[in-house]
């Protein structure tokens, strides 16, 4: 076999898209397995900038299959638009496959998302208002509409009527809002389904057939483990499982996963509300934000910035079974006189080594930092660790020591040729 899962080890935006694009060069199939179009990533390739939300990055390469698995919630309108934009950049999308079991995001999910978030007031979670949570709620409540339903006009009509009746009652009675029109949604979204019909199939069969043929399959997680609904900073999380969702969300058995690659930035960022122990609210945070262009791909919101938190990434390593590390954006820290790594927390005079479940407990913790000298040299052309200035190399080595995991790649810029490989993950799965 030859299967690799890529997961973010922080709160998303770690550069997973770049690493997925890089590692996908050795893959036959690239698959998403959770999340929705709330998870944007940017890929720089062939002199073009591709901004993807739903489509796996393998779609850029005609010899690869790109799979949207059953664990993904699909906004048909968003997906049709994304494919149209890719077509304008010369990407046909003919190699895309969409699970017939994937659930569909409809306009009432988006409206409900906005109303629920507004009703929370100061307790808002920081959702992207794209209907992800309400779609997963319908899935769990067993009233969701799947891609297979969207393609069947009678079934879609029947289920949409039932769902919209319930949602409109909620809009009017709970939120004092206006109801939505059935005909408008039905006609528009049925047509989206027809446009996507050519891509829809049982993707579990596609993936397992590829694995059984010993083809290299790359699974691409969205968001980050600290946004996992079970393992993240609940309730300030997403509605799916970036950490361990690959087997259920792709329809492959756990025994078929070979390596799990964790992606981290050399610092930490977060979009939206929720705990962030190493957050920087000073000029250092502003420096890193601007140097790293830290603004959301989907929302455009400025990301919150903090020092690298080894407690967070160790937690991610454990719960996701991470075997290898890709460290990105080291170049962003160039120009700082000093850099810090959070190695533990401290609460009431006691050292805390593991990330707590209780947000109250976490709010009482303070980060324990190791301070290292920074570097001023331009590192964007470095190809090996030895090419890095001593202080930058010491910083990278200290992170890997604290995490206890092998470094697979390190990146010193946004372009593919600025990602440097220490060991090829596909060689590891072939051993």
UniProtKB/Swiss-Prot annotation:
Its main location: cytoplasm. The keyword Thylakoid does not apply. GTP binds at residues 12-18, 40-42, 303, 329-331, 411-413. It is found in: Cytoplasm. Binds 1 Mg(2+) ion per subunit. Disulfide bonds: none annotated. GO terms for biological process: 'de novo' AMP biosynthetic process; IMP metabolic process. This is Adenylosuccinate synthetase. It comes from Lacticaseibacillus casei (strain BL23).
